[in-house]
């Protein structure tokens, strides 16, 4: 008779273990889509970045976006113009990018009035754009800091205020083109971009080197 309590305890223990295992197995898997969405909104200072070089052809002006030495931005450049060559750096593993003129080194940014300006330091969110591929195969560039405001140019190639732009407007539509004379094989697929380290990025980098 003394064996009965011990057997009951043994059975209850097995039943508890079975219930726990069943509860763990029916839990929903991690939401990878949500993780990607959240991480795409945060600047990635650790991963290797993709750098591309191309021109942006404006649908309305029929010419190319250029970054001038006086920090002005317009869409009046001819194909192959030295100021139309743009260096595009990925900000995250999503579709956020920084765009700067290869000749001047100024980043294309947007101020609080919606005006496009050139800046030497492109780390702020006002200098980050989200690439949106449209159904007509054109690309729209929405500013990250001022959501709903797009890079846009008039028929004469003058920049249009971001507050007056919408995704369906022709003024915000662009087409990527290789610089004149450049071949696809000439592009370096990856490169490193140096950012100021904070304590967290230092710790992550050092742990990866061990």
UniProtKB/Swiss-Prot annotation:
Single GO molecular function: growth factor activity
Keyword set, alphabetical order: Growth factor, Secreted, Signal
PROSITE patterns from the UniProt entry: HBGF_FGF
GO CC aspect terms: cytoplasm; extracellular space; lysosome
First and last residue of the signal peptide: 1-27
Keyword Transferase: no
Compartment(s): Secreted
Primary location group: secreted
Coiled coil residues, start to end: none
Superkingdom field: Eukaryota
Disruption phenotype: Morpholino knockdown of the protein causes a dramatic loss of cilia in Kupffer's vesicle.
Keyword Secreted: yes
Known function: Plays an important role in the regulation of embryonic development, cell proliferation, cell differentiation and cell migration. Required for Kupffer's vesicle ciliogenesis.
Quaternary structure, from the entry: Monomer. Homodimer.
Similarity comment: family membership: Belongs to the heparin-binding growth factors family.
Name this polypeptide is given: Fibroblast growth factor 8
């Amino acid at each position: 008779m003394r064996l009965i309590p011990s057997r009951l305890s043994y059975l209850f223990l097995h039943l508890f273990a079975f219930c726990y295992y069943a509860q763990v197995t029916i839990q929903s898997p991690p939401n990878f889509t949500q993780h990607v969405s959240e991480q795409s909104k945060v600047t990635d200072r650790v991963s290797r970045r993709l750098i591309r070089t191309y021109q942006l052809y404006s649908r309305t002006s029929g010419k190319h976006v250029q970054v001038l030495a006086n920090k002005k931005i317009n869409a009046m450049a001819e194909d192959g113009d030295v100021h139309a060559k743009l260096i595009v750096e990925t900000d995250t593993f999503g579709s956020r990018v920084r765009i700067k003129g290869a000749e001047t080194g100024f980043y294309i940014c947007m101020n609080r009035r919606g005006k496009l300006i050139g800046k030497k330091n492109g780390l702020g969110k006002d200098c980050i754009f989200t690439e949106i591929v449209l159904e007509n195969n054109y690309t729209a560039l929405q500013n990250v800091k001022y959501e709903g405001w797009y890079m846009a140019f008039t028929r004469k190639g003058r920049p249009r205020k971001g507050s007056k732009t919408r995704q369906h407007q022709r003024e915000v539509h662009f087409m990527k083109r290789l610089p004149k004379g450049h071949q696809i094989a000439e592009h370096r697929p990856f490169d490193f971009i140096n950012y100021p380290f904070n304590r967290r990025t230092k710790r992550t980098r050092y742990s990866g080197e061990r």
